[in-house]
């Protein structure tokens, strides 16, 4: 198995109060996080400062859930890369299915957001995933690859930019539904994404780029998923708001290091 550094991200989405963020982030920071695993949590934009202040661990990173594709300017309601970096952030989630499906973000917009963040030196957790209808129509790889190809069009073969990308496969039909892709289903897609990368970007880089799984990942299913050779970690939704997230950190560490 290639020595890819395990990655686990917690996406808090639009959840939590100031008091909750303070206590929950403090609890995660107090947990023993090994230096062999990347642990990142993404509170809502209004809670970023609170999370940063509550984080006492050098091993825990705070991320943003979204970023705009332009710099500072007249973009009401948006947040620029420069603003995130001014807060000391180094990670950002881009292209989550809720941004794509609910907010109308296109593949091209997601790719441009990612490119700008990467060019400014951030690490991007780039999300891809298919709906249930698309899976039933046997379009799973077509849809996921189309989303990656949009990013590929922006980044080309730039190893400097791609090395700061973490691909998150999140089947839309599994997010928040409690229906989890089987390890076999998830591994099949991860293999396909890695194959695309090898063929279209860099064969050597394909063995190093991290591809993580999201979609109702929790403490009960992450061990079996993490045993799949092409699943390098998780992007966790609901479970990241619970003490269970610390359990997942421990399980991933045990499984992949």
Curated annotation (Swiss-Prot):
Substrate binds at residues 11, 13. GO terms for molecular function: methylglyoxal synthase activity; triose-phosphate isomerase activity. Its EC number is 5.3.1.1, 4.2.3.3. The keyword Cytoplasm applies. Pathway: Carbohydrate biosynthesis; gluconeogenesis; Carbohydrate degradation; glycolysis; D-glyceraldehyde 3-phosphate from glycerone phosphate: step 1/1. It is found in: Cytoplasm. GO terms for biological process: gluconeogenesis; glyceraldehyde-3-phosphate biosynthetic process; glycerol catabolic process; glycolytic process. It catalyses: D-glyceraldehyde 3-phosphate = dihydroxyacetone phosphate; dihydroxyacetone phosphate = methylglyoxal + phosphate. Keywords: Cytoplasm, Gluconeogenesis, Glycolysis, Isomerase, Lyase. One of its GO terms (cellular component) is cytosol. The active site is at 96 (electrophile), 170 (proton acceptor). Pfam families: TIM. Homodimer. Belongs to the triosephosphate isomerase family. This is Triosephosphate isomerase. It comes from Giardia intestinalis (Giardia lamblia).
């Amino acid at each position: 198995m290639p020595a890819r550094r395990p990655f686990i991200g917690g996406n808090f989405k639009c959840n939590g109060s100031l008091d909750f963020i303070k206590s929950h982030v403090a609890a995660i920071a107090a947990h023993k996080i090994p230096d062999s695993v990347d642990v990142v949590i993404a509170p809502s934009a209004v809670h970023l400062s609170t999370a940063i202040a509550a984080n006492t661990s050098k091993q825990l990173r705070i991320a943003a859930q979204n970023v705009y594709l332009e710099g500072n300017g007249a973009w009401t309601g948006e947040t620029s890369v420069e603003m995130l970096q001014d807060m000391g952030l180094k990670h950002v989630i881009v292209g989550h299915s809720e941004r794509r499906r609910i907010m109308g973000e296109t593949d091209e917009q997601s790719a441009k957001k990612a490119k700008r963040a990467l060019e400014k030196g951030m690490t991007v957790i780039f999300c891809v995933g298919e709906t249930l209808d698309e899976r039933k129509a046997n379009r799973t790889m077509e849809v996921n690859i189309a989303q990656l190809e949009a990013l590929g069009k922006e980044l080309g073969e730039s190893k400097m930019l791609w090395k700061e990308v973490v691909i998150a496969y999140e089947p839309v039909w599994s997010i928040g539904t409690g229906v989890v892709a089987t390890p076999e289903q998830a591994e099949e897609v991860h293999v396909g994404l890695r194959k695309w990368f090898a063929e279209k970007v860099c064969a050597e880089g394909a063995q190093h780029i991290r591809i993580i799984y999201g979609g109702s990942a929790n403490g009960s299913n992450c061990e079996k998923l993490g045993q799949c050779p092409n699943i390098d970690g998780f992007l966790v939704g609901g479970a990241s708001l619970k003490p269970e997230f610390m359990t997942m950190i421990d399980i991933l560490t045990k499984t992949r290091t």
